[in-house]
């Protein structure tokens, strides 16, 4: 194809794409969804009276805040959540306001990536129990974990201790540091299931050596969903002069969190999972006493200004500020519902689906200790192959699940998951097993 033909093809494709987008925006379902999202700042939430009278009806009303079609069942918040209408509305309002280019201060827009963003850090700090000066707004836990792994002064032979159930976004930053700078990554092997907190603490304590500099672990592991005894692990680290860094990707929005009570040195999270904040909104918490021990990974103006505290870690240049509007709305929504209520719902739904799966012969990887479980259920179901059942569930039943090779199923139970949805999933699982037997 000559240059003129190529450019013509590109132009044609662009026109076709624009026409397709226009047709999509005219589609009644999509138009209706966005009209709903834009109709009001915060769609009316069910009240305490309904919750007291009929809990399931209360959650059914909250389910209407989400764009997930009524005939679909979503059991994969462990990967990514669905942002509800108040969050989508806030993101739209953020774009609607900022894209006018009408900021009163001429410097406001071009230095977006250099602002304190206190209007977003303040509510987050209150939500997780810290000061805003200890918070940097980053894109997700992976980015925060990379800042930690790259930013600490570690020497050849220094050891970082973690579990064998870390997400790649938590483990790989340390592996990169090991390959480049000669640190040593050591792992403790967690049993499946973890019987109790003491087992975890003993495994870590036995693995600590005089060269251990950092204990890094997932507050809730991505593999089995076990809630590790974070407060006790951080206390163990502190008692031995070791830094503690916690990957809390799953925690914010799933269960109550107070980083001060955990007494950790560093904490990261991905609120797009269980808080259902916009994708690309995350945070890095660094205890004030540790901030000056962490070097910037991404550098621009302000990186060497100690008075900025953790703010300097969020200075990356132009950023998606409307996503932060959405995260603020997600915090407000969680606060309006109540994290205690949300956590209780998460645990009840997960315990129910776990019992039902075990009745059907699944091998539970969830801890028998209720304190070490929340809203992720992992079971092993050999000889079922996860890739096959994932595809079958989605293509034939519109049910989204997640798992791991060869036969692990991981089920997430967000608060808007209804009992009738769980029953439908279980019926589909029974049908699949019968089909394969």
Indicate where each model-derived feature is located.
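Twin-arginine (Tat) signal peptide motif
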Residues: 1-7
